[in-house]
Amino acid sequence: MRDFTSELNAFEAAVFEQRPFPAERYDDEYFVADWREAHNRYDIETRRQIEGRNPALIKQVFAPRRVLDMGCGPGALMHLLHELGIDVDGIDFSPHSPTLAPPEVRDRIVVGEVTEPHVEPRTYDLVICREVLEHLTVLQARRTVEQICRASSRYVYVTTRFHPEPDGLLSFTTQLDVDPTHITLLNKEFLRCLLVLEGFRSRPDLEQRMDWAGKGRVLVLERQTDRA
């Protein structure tokens, strides 16, 4: 039988060595300056090009009535979904996010920690959390998963940067060369386990449809009402 003790001990040590970034780290310069590769800024037209088919696919695949974007940043995806007639709200812990957001969605962004409850349970039939978890510690990521699932009455759609070569289920790493706040790249199947433990079942068929760019960074799960 495999002994998991050393793997668990290493995981425990690494988890408690992590330190979270304060909200102030995500200021105007973080979102709109040209420091990212390919000038990947958070203004609407740049995000429209980067998002490509995503907003239309979200509407087509999930047919949502109400959407919550957890870790929405300055609301670019919210705005693109709003253009498609989707009722969408957002939560972000940076106080700069609403001020940078388009006026159409600015008042729909709640400033607060994604690790804490801000909405009533099962209020949204789709909860989105994209490119957020890599900015959090493992402990914060676990609490965020809990809040994502708490808010959803049906689907969760998550994307993040995953560990490219994990040695085990508990492996995680950083990606500081891409973004100095990318402190947690989890094993994809570990994150799936966290979502399953909240009472959600994997939907590989929907993951395939949403991962149209073939990046392998998509998770889609659906609530199992009789078990959650």
Locate the predicted segments by residue:
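Conserved N-terminal segment of class I S-adenosyl-L-methionine
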Residues: M1-R122, L126-I128, L139-E146, F162, ...
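Short catalytic micro-motifs in class I SAM-dependent methyltransferases
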Residues: R130-H135
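Conserved helix-to-beta-strand junction in the class I
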Residues: Q147-A151
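Conserved beta-strand signature within the Rossmann-like core of class I S-adenosyl-L-methionine
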Residues: S153-F162
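Feature marks short, surface-exposed loop/turn motifs that line or immediately flank catalytic pockets
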Residues: P164-P166
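Short glycine/proline- and charge-enriched loop/turn segments
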Residues: L170-D179
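A SAM-dependent methyltransferase catalytic signature shared across enzymes that methylate proteins
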Residues: L191-D205
